[in-house]
Amino acid sequence: MGTALLQRGGCFLLCLSLLLLGCWAELGSGLEFPGAEGQWTRFPKWNACCESEMSFQLKTRSARGLVLYFDDEGFCDFLELILTRGGRLQLSFSIFCAEPATLLADTPVNDGAWHSVRIRRQFRNTTLFIDQVEAKWVEVKSKRRDMTVFSGLFVGGLPPELRAAALKLTLASVREREPFKGWIRDVRVNSSQVLPVDSGEVKLDDEPPNSGGGSPCEAGEEGEGGVCLNGGVCSVVDDQAVCDCSRTGFRGKDCSQEDNNVEGLAHLMMGDQGKSKGKEEYIATFKGSEYFCYDLSQNPIQSSSDEITLSFKTLQRNGLMLHTGKSADYVNLALKNGAVSLVINLGSGAFEALVEPVNGKFNDNAWHDVKVTRNLRQHSGIGHAMVTISVDGILTTTGYTQEDYTMLGSDDFFYVGGSPSTADLPGSPVSNNFMGCLKEVVYKNNDVRLELSRLAKQGDPKMKIHGVVAFKCENVATLDPITFETPESFISLPKWNAKKTGSISFDFRTTEPNGLILFSHGKPRHQKDAKHPQMIKVDFFAIEMLDGHLYLLLDMGSGTIKIKALLKKVNDGEWYHVDFQRDGRSGTISVNTLRTPYTAPGESEILDLDDELYLGGLPENKAGLVFPTEVWTALLNYGYVGCIRDLFIDGQSKDIRQMAEVQSTAGVKPSCSKETAKPCLSNPCKNNGMCRDGWNRYVCDCSGTGYLGRSCEREATVLSYDGSMFMKIQLPVVMHTEAEDVSLRFRSQRAYGILMATTSRDSADTLRLELDAGRVKLTVNLDCIRINCNSSKGPETLFAGYNLNDNEWHTVRVVRRGKSLKLTVDDQQAMTGQMAGDHTRLEFHNIETGIITERRYLSSVPSNFIGHLQSLTFNGMAYIDLCKNGDIDYCELNARFGFRNIIADPVTFKTKSSYVALATLQAYTSMHLFFQFKTTSLDGLILYNSGDGNDFIVVELVKGYLHYVFDLGNGANLIKGSSNKPLNDNQWHNVMISRDTSNLHTVKIDTKITTQITAGARNLDLKSDLYIGGVAKETYKSLPKLVHAKEGFQGCLASVDLNGRLPDLISDALFCNGQIERGCEGPSTTCQEDSCSNQGVCLQQWDGFSCDCSMTSFSGPLCNDPGTTYIFSKGGGQITYKWPPNDRPSTRADRLAIGFSTVQKEAVLVRVDSSSGLGDYLELHIHQGKIGVKFNVGTDDIAIEESNAIINDGKYHVVRFTRSGGNATLQVDSWPVIERYPAGRQLTIFNSQATIIIGGKEQGQPFQGQLSGLYYNGLKVLNMAAENDANIAIVGNVRLVGEVPSSMTTESTATAMQSEMSTSIMETTTTLATSTARRGKPPTKEPISQTTDDILVASAECPSDDEDIDPCEPSSGGLANPTRAGGREPYPGSAEVIRESSSTTGMVVGIVAAAALCILILLYAMYKYRNRDEGSYHVDESRNYISNSAQSNGAVVKEKQPSSAKSSNKNKKNKDKEYYV
């Protein structure tokens, strides 16, 4: 807990403990606490964790005071015992930050008598016993029951540095406690006596006076102030009062006699004011390279008691003030981190003392007086010497040297202010000389008095002065601290010539965990083993921080030594003093007061550094530098961020602030301050970057964001891979590392594929990340065999994550530190591992992604990657962006920049009889399949593999939906893939099918996932060939029952992944059948906006497209031929269509379209009526020159009219009307669509439609003009009239215009009729070239949903409109009308028909007629296909390609053909999709 005020060697502690134990045991001595500020005693740590007790005896007359305290150094747990409330003991403690528990004793103990106190700890309970007559216990309410103890056991008070550092005390209020005044003895822990480790302002007393509270220093004649007069300082030595008169100008036992001869130190305090009684002061200024050297060889010192006095004034924190002696017989007095350090060794170990002020430091540029005394004493028959050091006469520390050697003998030199090599002086805690002023340096013993300052000024022949010393006090320039603000900032220092010996010291302060502080290396030399390639070796020296710990690294050619300088972390924002000293192969590294020795391996003692010494980091251009593998921060690009001050090299100060200015170093600031505000509080990291507080800066972890930059503000480049693409970083030189930081983001739909790997041209060394069965697999192989390691285990592997082939972004992080591995995926728990063997060096020439090209040493090659990579960072280098920006010239790649849709190795199965056979699918225990497909076919077998017994696997399309069928031995199972619509839409779809070892089956189509767990058998035992695209024709009959396929797959397959294997469907095929080609040409002609004229609907098919012209009034392959046209002349005429009585439809939705030209203001064009007595009707009419529709389906008359278009202008117009229940739409030409949504609940069924009347003669408003291309719910009545249909009757003045087109001569009619006669649901993606703007409403973003008639058979229970309120469920499924945005029904898009019952004979006739129609349709379609204009569109997809998302449906190249005048004015933005049933 904190920095101890006394530091001793282990031997000395043991001897001192034995000494004190003897004193305590034989004489019953105790510790006297005078109640002074700064008093304290520290005993060894009492492990009061669980069950333990300690006891002591106490004697006092004080009513208040801190008796005892210990804690966990600033976290949660503590225990405090104080005197309070009239001299009663109060105990408080806490565990795990719980509310402190407190008990107050009933018995006062401040009566001047001895009292026994015992404290018993039992987990959450603590009991206080007093004099065996009182016992009280208390329990703390904490979640944890064990108490944590880190500090020593403090008795009587706390050390000053702990009071000044509140963060190191768990109980902050303990700083304000009054010190204890009285005596304490017989301290025991678990019945065993314990001795104090160190103390301050506390005296050892054999037996306190019975009066209590007194001491020899308080005795004296009545009326006198005490034993020591004239300001003398009293201390108790061997139970006697001893007066220190050195600062008074008096002498004698009680400082009563004026001293006219002997110089004390008191007058020095007045020296600056000239009040020294006229005596000359001997002062000298030292600037770091000067020192005095007094030769003792002629008159060696031999003394048992001696005294050293001096005064100093400085701004420097560290520096040697005085030293004499060598080997194991010396005295060293120095300033260490602003405190006064004394080290004495008389042969049996060092006595060390460190005196610190209560507040601040001694390097405050004020005068301070130091006095060191040593006296030989015989105590209880044991010889020892008591050493006392005091600063300014107040801060005093007392201790003992060992009993074996009590004489200080020195025939060496007295060094003052420094030495030739301070770091090499025995026991020296610092390595640099003093910088400041020293005054009146005096050594005296019983025989000699050496006034060293006077001798130097007077030029005594035994005194040598090194350097130019000014014998007055001058200001010495301070070594200002500097701050390295960024990891890239650094300072270059001159070459360090430290071949045999050397020292470096500095102070640093930071909160950052990593950073290279110092680094230099020597000339490269080649070491060649007979078996292995040449290796470059260098001598080097480095000091670095890793994970908050400070490390020394040194190699003198015989092997590297790596020392952790301190067990605790040093990135807590406090100043730390580092002192490195070496002499040949051995030396020390010390941090503050803790010193760690080292011995370098091998025989070499020469450190040959040829390069500059870098401070704070390394230059960006590292071409000339050689980085040893052991210096991890250099290879990880961790520059130091924090403060540095007081840099001394070989005892010489370095003005690093001035060096930074001369070098114009960016990111170096000439000061050091710690900002109180935490930078991360302002959320500076954008795009969800993780923020960490650094040293006066924020550090953003952008690895999981897809962004780069200091604040994650710059979007990272994406690379797209299609299985044949790669990026390879070919490093300029071979790299050797022992630590790596790797991070990347990936997105893939495949369960297998290489993400990143380091590769070597000379070895099997690799660090590899890959996808393996949907998990991330890390492989590290250090090829120990090649370099002749002692032990080798082979590659280490770690796995992390599950189901990572979900086409989502995932982040992978790898951290290796020597043998330690850590793998993290996203924010999941990190997977850790420890590598076996002695070898830790990774060798690599390349960093590869997508494909491993360096395969010489690979036993198996990982699967190529298909997907996307982003933010690949290796040891701080963002290689993808560096390649893209041209910042490095050693990257090779053919992967595509940017996020692109990936279609890998596409293959076209041009016919349904085409297929390939591959080797058996290996899916015994688990399986991961992936492929992409594009088709316009509803059905087709995609994949089939049979096996032993009934085992098999099938993937097929059924009515546009994907089926996964399998049998593991327990019977066939079917899983239907989930999709919002049929998949035969001529778009690419992604399919992933997997089975894990627990029989969890997963089918993912694009983003929709279906899962199912099956019981029983877990293995899929496949034996025969794997068929892709179909099977032989005769095989379809023998496929398992749950398989629907009767023909093969027609379309494109791509990115086929069979359990990690990427087959070439053509090259790897055992045999092929039918027409199979590379690439994906798709349909030779594809639907475009203007494929069909006059708002015809384009129907995409694999071998082309057809146009549905039913709602256009036009005909022909492209809807640009006139429809069947009749002229109704003056006097009127009428065309009537009558449904057979047993075949009258009832519909929920109707579609009507017709073209016309007229000049009439009033007329009826078309009227549809229901059977007699029902009253349902629909009428298209002209009223006042405007077109309108009226209809009634059982509730009220509903009207809709286009009021803005005048249509009796003699020009040709097309009107389109749709109804869905009571809702309706009306459109004239390309005018906006009019919508009608009547209020209230409406009946929906147009019942039992009987007649269609064209011409309006019966209604008394005969039409006069031209009518063309009438379409109503699948009936082309004018075409049927021209063909003399038996159900058509023509009366009046009606004449057919032009040729008589057949109702089955166009592809549009064929499509419509086939749809009407079909009983299966058929959905096809279509493109409608029409304006969809709605009057009074913004245009909808949804496609117009358009279907052919949905034919439903009505039962006898639903004959009338009574069923409209709650209509019957149809016996065969139908497609529901989609609702538009806002929840309202759309304008009608489908004709829904309910037909009355018909006889069996009628059904047979209908089937025969349908078959005949199909044959005619096929013949005509083939004729038109052979003669149609082939110049529309052509698609040529390469074997491997990545398309832009805007062209993901085939990336076709469009060749426009001439359009009619009407189609040329179409709004090309009006593009929708329609679905046909």
From Swiss-Prot:
S-S bridge residues: C228-C243, C245-C255, C437-C473, C643-C672, C680-C691, C685-C700, C702-C712, C883-C891, C1052-C1080, C1087-C1098, C1092-C1107, C1109-C1119
Give GO BP annotations, semicolon-separated: adult behavior; axon guidance; chemical synaptic transmission; gephyrin clustering involved in postsynaptic density assembly; learning; neuroligin clustering involved in postsynaptic membrane assembly; neuromuscular process controlling balance; neuron cell-cell adhesion
Name this polypeptide is given: Neurexin-1
Cite the record's note on assembly: Interacts (via laminin G-like domain 2 and/or laminin G-like domain 6) with NLGN1 forming a heterotetramer, where one NLGN1 dimer interacts with one NRXN1 dimer. Also interacts (via laminin G-like domain 2 and/or laminin G-like domain 6) with NLGN2, NLGN3 and NLGN4L; interactions with NLGN1, NLGN2, NLGN3 and NLGN4L are calcium-dependent. Interacts (via cytoplasmic C-terminal region) with CASK (via the PDZ, SH3 and guanylate kinase-like domains). Interacts (via cytoplasmic C-terminus) with CASKIN1 and APBA1. Interacts (via laminin G-like domain 2) with NXPH1 and NXPH3.
Lineage: superkingdom:
Eukaryota
List the record's Gene Ontology CC terms alphabetically: cell projection; cell surface; endoplasmic reticulum; neuronal cell body; nuclear membrane; nucleolus; plasma membrane; presynaptic membrane
Q: Cross-referenced InterPro entries, in alphabetical order? A: ConA-like_dom_sf, EGF-like_dom, EGF-type_Asp/Asn_hydroxyl_site, Laminin_G, Neurexin-like, Neurexin-related_CASP, Syndecan/Neurexin_dom
Question: A single GO molecular function, which one?
Answer: acetylcholine receptor binding
**Organism name:** Homo sapiens (Human)
